[in-house]
Amino acid sequence: MPSIVIVGAQWGDEGKGKIIDYLAQEADVVIRAQGGNNAGHTVMVEDKKYSFHLLPSGVLFEDKLNIIGNGVVFDPEGFLQEIEVLKKEGINTSNIKIDERVHVIFPYHKRIDQLEEEARGEAQIGTTKKGIGPCYMDKIQRSGIRLGEMIDEEDFKDRLYKQVDDKNKIIEKIYEAEGFEKEAMYETYLKYAREIKKYVTDTTILAHEALKAKKKVLFEGAQGTLLDIDLGTYPYVTSSHPTAGGFPIGAGIGPNQIEQVLGIVKAYTTRVGSGTFPTELDNEVGDKIRIKGNEFGTTTGRPRRCGWFDGVMVRYTTRINGLTAMSLMLLDVLSGFDTLKICTGYELEGEMVAHFPANIKTLGKCKPIYEELPGWEEDITNMKTYEELPENAKKYIERIESYVGVPIKMISVGPKRNQTIIRERLF
C-alpha cells in the first residue's frame, strides 16, 4: 500500500507541482483533497510550461487516474477551461474523476469574496477572490450545492434559485452592489453540468480500491501548512486544511492508509498577501531572490514577499504534519550569494524563543536569530547527483536537515523535471 502525501511546509508556492509531477511518473493514482482553484501549480515538461489551478498534476500522464476528492471546492468554469487546454494539446482527459460530494463555486461566491475583501479596507487578508471562503462557508452552514446535486437536473433549478435569492439579499442590501439574474446563471451552469457529468462519481470508492490493491497513490497538496484554517497564521489563512491531517477527510480514506508525508520547502521563504513574516527581506537581497526565483504568484501574478529560510517555522510544520521526509526546492536560486542565513530561533522581548507562536501578534514581535553559512558561486542547474554539489551547498542542506530533524530526500536545482537530485527514492 505505497501512499505518499505531499504537503507544502511553508506558506504555499513551495514548488509542489514539480515534485508531484516528478513522482506522478511512478504513481498509479493522483488525488487532490482540499482547496480549490485559488492555488496554482506549475509543471515543466521539456520546454512546455503548464499551469494548473484545479486539476491534479498527474493529468499529463494518460495512464494515471486523477481524482478531485470530496474536500475540494469546485469551480466548473475553471475546470472546463483547464480541460480545454489539455484537449488542445491532444491530452486525453478520460482519466479525470471528480467526487460527487465536492461543493460547487458559483458567481455569487466570487462576488461576495470580492465585496467582503474590499469592505475590510486596510485589514484585508489577501484573498484571491476566487470564492473559496464563501463556498466553504455555505458548506459549513449546510446550504451549499454539491456537484452531485448540480448534475441532477430535476433538483438543481430549485436549489440554485433559492441560493441566488439569498445571496442577492446580501450583495444588494449589505454591500449595495448588483445581484445576479437567476435564469441566466441556471442556463450557464446547467450547460456546465452536462459537460462535466461524465467525470463525476464516488471517488472514495476508487481511492479505497487503489489502496487495497497496493497501487501507488500520490496525495497532492495545495497551498501550504501555514495557510491551514486551524494551524496556520490565522486570520491570514485559507478556508481548508492543507496539512497532512486534511487528506484522509478530503479524500475519504482512513488515516492509517497514509504511509509517508513529504514536506515541500523552498531553500528560502516566500509569502503572497498579508500577514507577519519574520525573515522577510524588504531590501535588495529580497529583490534578488524574487527576480532569480521568478517569485510571482501563479494564480494572481502578485510579487511574492521573499526572505531567508525560517527553520523555526519549518520545524513547526514538520511536527504538525508528521513529516517523514522533505524536498528542498529552488536551491539553484541561492547560487551567487556570498553569505546565506538560516533562522534558528526568535528573539521575543529580549528572550530567545525556539517555537513558532500560535498568535500572530506575538509572531509579529519576533525577530529572527540567524546562523550564517558561506554561499557558493557555482551554477548547479545541471548537476545530477548530491556528490556533484558544491561543498557549501551540501553544508547548507545538511544544516537544514539537522535543525529540522527530517531527511531531505529530493533537491530541485531547476524548473524542469530532470533538474531533480534524488538522494533516496520514495516510491
Swiss-Prot record:
Cofactor notes: Binds 1 Mg(2+) ion per subunit.
Enzyme Commission number, as recorded: 6.3.4.4
Catalytic activity as recorded in UniProt: IMP + L-aspartate + GTP = N(6)-(1,2-dicarboxyethyl)-AMP + GDP + phosphate + 2 H(+)
Organism: Alkaliphilus metalliredigens (strain QYMF)
Binding site for GTP: 12-18, 40-42, 304, 330-332, 412-414
Protein name (record): Adenylosuccinate synthetase
Gene this chain is encoded by: purA
InterPro entries cross-referenced by the UniProt entry: Adenylosuccin_syn_GTP-bd, Adenylosuccin_syn_Lys_AS, Adenylosuccinate_synth_dom1, Adenylosuccinate_synth_dom2, Adenylosuccinate_synth_dom3, Adenylosuccinate_synthetase, P-loop_NTPase
One function term, GO molecular function aspect: adenylosuccinate synthase activity
